[in-house]
Amino acid sequence: MFGISSGQIFLCFHIAAVTVCAIRVLYRQRNTGTAFAWLMVLFVFPLFGVAAYLLVGEARLGMARAKRVEQMNAFYRQFAERHFQHEDLDTDNKMRRRYQGIANVAASVTGLAASNNNAMQLLTQTDEILEAMLADIQSARQTCALAFYIIEPQGRIQTLLAAVRDAAQRGVECTILADAVGSRAFFGSEWEDNLKAAGVRIVPALPVGVLKTFFSRSDLRNHRKILIVDNLVAYTGSFNLIDPRHFKQDAGVGEWVDMMMRCHGTAVLEMAAVFYADVAVEADEHLAEVRQEIEKLDDKIPELLALKRQSGTAVAQVIPSAPDQSDPVIYETIVCAIHAAKTRVTITTPYFVPDELLLTALTTAAKRGVDVVLILPEKVDSFLVRWASRAYYPKLLAAGVKIALFHGGLLHAKTLVVDGDYALFGTVNMDMRSFFLNLEISLAIYDRDTTKQICNLQRDYLKNSSYIAIKSWQQRSKLR
């Protein structure tokens, strides 16, 4: 009727779609390189680019979930303001001034400040990790909360799951939050059925499906590892619920090498807040259940905090990150910590694929005289990550960064130590997925005594590693 062909209508819609996507790229993409790449794809391959951006261009977790997350964050901020007294959070006399700003960066996003009454025990061997966790679960009287990316019910993990089952049968309130993709071997197994039959609440984190793909991204995962018993003791670190003697034995990388921190103090309540918020967002549509549970604790909180003030003197801060946060808080914390370094930065990570900002932080630190050491596994279980990591070696080595390859298995521990008096560890790999896409958790340590434990662990890793010589690596690259 208007003399407009169907082709012209399609062209107009297509131009509009590309324009809208391009505007969203400019406003929503945090990383400049990523934004530029998306713009190139949109304008060079417009049809494919629009479809791809709608599917994976943004870290979408769904509108309903995003609303619940916002409500839970507001609720926990009020909870912290009501219960955490100034004396618990007064760290000025115990924290070096140059780290106070770094702590504020995280607190401004998460609402969780550093606390000064924590006790930390570093566990570095699978046997001692499992034995400690098992003992705490067996002694649980009120609650037992587990959140893990991978739960693989084989070997010694079956003993731990049996302890959770037994705890539920004697009246302990037990909840397991497991990533729907990472723990696919657990879901649908006999262990899931047995635990449910015993009264354990099992919640899949970020479930996937064809229809869900249109509303949220299926590649966003809950990568956190947390165990909390009676709100008095908590664990976090790199350890999944896997038995290294059975897990990925055909990958050719050796057994996974992990660490966990066993914690007492205010940090335990902060980890509990993260856990129950995750459960509520996944399983409590109107957030009524979790509010009721936390309100039940109101009378108990003063007693719990009184116990926690007697726990220890370590200054620690729980830092959770998620793609729906206003800023990539753990990523920003890492970059700030590296820039604050004066003498030494030591990092262990299984997967190292930095962006330009992190790469620049490492290379400029080395150039200004900081001893920068990366401890990476000699072999990893991802072909693409292995070659992507190696692409950065020449620039790092040329700047003076030392790269040590660990020979004792797949080094899965994620640690960062600055100048021997600041440490960051937890679930975060040094790659873009951990920084911008996954739900992660880290623990920042601001005192020398606790940090020394992690320094000693890093030294042990170095004893089983060999440094890459820049000349031999350059020659190797030329030959290839």
Give the label of every model feature segment.
Residues 341, 351-373, 377, 382:
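Helical hairpin unit composed of two closely spaced alpha helices linked by a short loop
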Residues 414:
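Catalytic-core elements of nucleic-acid end-processing and repair enzymes
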Residues 403-407:
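Active-site donor-binding acidic/aromatic loop of nucleotide-activated sugar
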